[in-house]
Regions:
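N-terminal loops that bind phosphate or other acidic moieties
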Residues: 1-346
Length: 346
């Protein structure tokens, strides 16, 4: 029997063929909650691009910002809900992983822009858009990361759509494929193999998808009740961390900000910012651009941004200090910024 009511995922055993805006909102909350439950595990895997132990925190802050845009919304149009999620993720994106996650949501939303509700074929298209947009947002895409995980997940979504119109079936297949891709990340990225871990950003994305599926299966409550936490596994030891020879990072400062202006050229901004350091992710449009980069001099990208318009949500983190905290057994400092979104209440 098909199940397509406005506000709830399918009951156990039901076939789910149509997803509405309220359903997507609940799934986004489920993904956020499951990531929140497993943030420490994601942080413990963080060795690339810098072993600063904050990937889980950055992805969580990004998801909180995304969900804050829709938490009280009564919108039923699934394309508009997806667009709100994407906008919230972009504005609140933290760190390299958070900005890439925002681009996954951006591509996902673009694929659903004109949909009142989505079917399996629409969801497969959205997954492909998520993968394509994420790759385009990174100056030099690296395999063995969150990019690989979303790309393989998108491929599986397309195959699942050809076999069934059941959305839950697709989510099950996508999660399984993403988990398999995650397990193979050490084969693609030597730094992960050296540390004996899978990619932290990819793991964070898997947790988000797992939360969504658990809710669709009726295995995850959104009413504030305690939920089971996935096994955390072992944290990366200080000896296994990919600490640069000599202990110093070439680009020790993580700089993030939002640039707003008129007639901005995102391609030109990306090229200029990229010349200042590495781990560049610059995304947006002619009015709003999100900038993330690792640099020697944090003043350089900030000054450039000011020359083009107005900068806000500025975050500057000393990754050298974060790395040393991890190496010496301390906890990595949490990402911080003025106006960071609050935790989602149960």
């Amino acid at each position: 029997m098909a199940f397509d009511t406005m506000t709830a995922p399918p009951p156990a055993g039901g076939k789910w063929v149509r997803c509405t805006g309220p359903q997507l909102r609940k799934m986004a909350r489920a993904g956020l909650l499951w990531l929140e439950q497993n943030r420490d595990h994601v942080n413990s895997l963080n060795v690339f691009p810098v072993p600063d132990g904050d990937t889980g925190t950055n992805m969580l802050l990004t998801m909180r910002s995304a969900y804050a845009r829709i938490e009280l919304s009564e919108e039923t149009h699934v394309g508009k809900v997806a667009g709100q999620i994407a906008q919230g993720a972009l504005m609140g994106a933290r760190g390299n992983s958070g900005v890439i996650l925002s681009q996954i949501w951006r591509g996902f939303a673009a694929g659903l822009a004109n949909k009142e509700a989505f079917l399996a074929a629409d969801l497969a298209q959205a997954f492909q858009g998520a993968s394509d947009t994420a790759y385009k947002g990174v100056m030099r895409p690296v395999e063995g990361t969150i990019l690989t995980v979303i790309r393989e997940g998108a491929a599986e979504a397309a195959d699942a759509a050809r076999k069934s119109d059941d959305l839950r079936f697709m989510l099950e297949r996508v999660l399984e494929r993403c988990q398999q891709a995650l397990e193979r990340t050490p084969e693609l990225l030597p730094i992960l193999r050296q540390a004996g871990v899978v990619d932290s950003g990819g793991q964070g994305l898997v947790y988000i998808f797992e939360g969504m599926l658990r809710y669709a299966q009726g295995k995850l409550s959104l009413d504030g009740q305690q939920v089971a936490v996935a096994p955390a596994g072992e944290a990366v030891s200080a000896q296994a961390l990919a600490v640069p020879e000599g202990g110093s990072l070439e680009f020790p400062y993580d700089v993030q900000f939002i640039l707003t202006g008129r007639n901005l050229n995102v391609h030109e901004v990306r090229a200029r910012i990229d010349a200042m350091g590495d781990s560049t992710v610059v995304v947006g449009d002619d009015r709003v651009i999100k900038v993330h980069i690792h640099v020697k001099d944090p003043g350089q990208p900030l000054t450039y941004g000011i020359s083009l318009g107005h900068i806000s949500d500025v975050v500057v983190e000393n990754m050298q200090e974060q790395m040393e905290e991890l190496v010496h057994g301390g906890a990595a400092p949490l990402a911080s910024a003025a106006g960071a979104p609050p935790a989602v209440a149960p």
